[in-house]
Amino acid sequence: MNLRKKDCKIAVIGTGNAGIISAIMTIYTYRLLNLDEPRLTMFHDSKVPTELTGQGTTLNISHAIEKIVCDEDLNNPAGITPKVGFYYRGWGKKNEKILYKLGENAMAYHFDPPKLRQAFLNKDLVDVIEKHVTPEDIKDDFDLIIDCRGKSVNNWDEYYDMPSPTNYCLLGRTRDGRPPEVWTEHIATPDGWTFKIPLEDGYSYGYLFNDKITSPEIAEKNFDEMFGMKTLHKVPFKGYLSKNYYDQKNKTLLNGNRLFFFEPLESNATPMYGIAVNEFINSVIRHGEKGAVYAKKKYQILIQETYQWVMWHYMYGSKYDSEFWKYAQDQSKNYKYSKHFLSMIDYVRRTCNWKKYVGQNEFPERIISEFDYNDYATWYFSNV
């Protein structure tokens, strides 16, 4: 496999969120390496519905979006909003509110997936073909195929089961102007937890619970009562991870929901989509086919630890002593974490200055817009 050659051709199957992120990260990786960009082709099948996904990133994806697509300036075609960290409300027993930054003065983005998709395609950086294809159909025409077709429902033997405390999500949306918050909120509820994402024109909500403990009908009622939110979509799910990240025979790298799905705590999916592409291309360019094997092993370890990171968040329960939280806490405490993960957690415990993160992170009452964000950032970073 030679991804360095000038006439390199890469295909992305699927133009949903994972497909778009894969294409963006492919271009971004080649530009960082100062290499000629490959001929990039995206295959779109309008008969396949796009999976409903979250809209949060961490630093790797945000840098790529800013360099390849757009930033907040010039009419903000991707609908991005700033994100400085995660705000936990009601998690654990000691502190009602905890906000932590992504890193010193670092900033990521929230985004509107349909807007990001269209903004990227409008750049004319890729060829888009409306056609249903499989990797086997096109393997002879491309040097690498990134398969983002979503999860097939009938091949569970090809995946590891990755259970989590939640298995169901109710989605809601407001459209009432730009919110003031610049963080993703994770709000504990008696049934589970809810994400609240500030977008350009309102909030995106996701009410997560376990349907073995709370019925969807009761959860829908509670979603409305707690957040004033009408359910737009009901999404049952299960956690899984593909046993084969890279198919050497068909030169195919899996990504998106074709590769894995975990519950959306800490916006884990989108950044992992970017890492999958970046790590693989970098390794293959440097080491050829051996690099593909190395990237596969490294990514499997990383994604396993991402899953452990999600599970660990339930370790100390929440302010609710509900059936769900007792179940979630037991599942977290009984999980067999890797030694490397536990050593990482121990290091964070010993070295982190938690006073920076607890009890002083309310945002100002005035509305924050893109025009006074710099003033807000100055206030924020002087108060955490």
Describe these PLM feature segments:
Residues 15, 27-53:
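Glycine-rich FAD pyrophosphate-binding loop
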Residues 79-151:
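Feature captures the FAD/FMN-dependent oxidoreductase FAD-binding
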Residues 110, 200, 209-314:
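FAD/FMN-dependent oxidoreductases across multiple families
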Residues 24, 28-32, 122, 282:
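Short, well-ordered alpha-helices that flank and scaffold nucleotide-derived cofactor binding pockets
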Residues 282-384:
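Long, low-complexity C-terminal extensions of enzymes
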Residues 119-227:
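Predominantly flavin-linked oxidoreductase catalytic cores and closely associated redox partners
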Residues 4-18:
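Beta1/beta-strand and adjacent pyrophosphate-binding region of the FAD-binding site
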Residues 46-98:
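N-terminal FAD cofactor-binding segment of flavoenzymes
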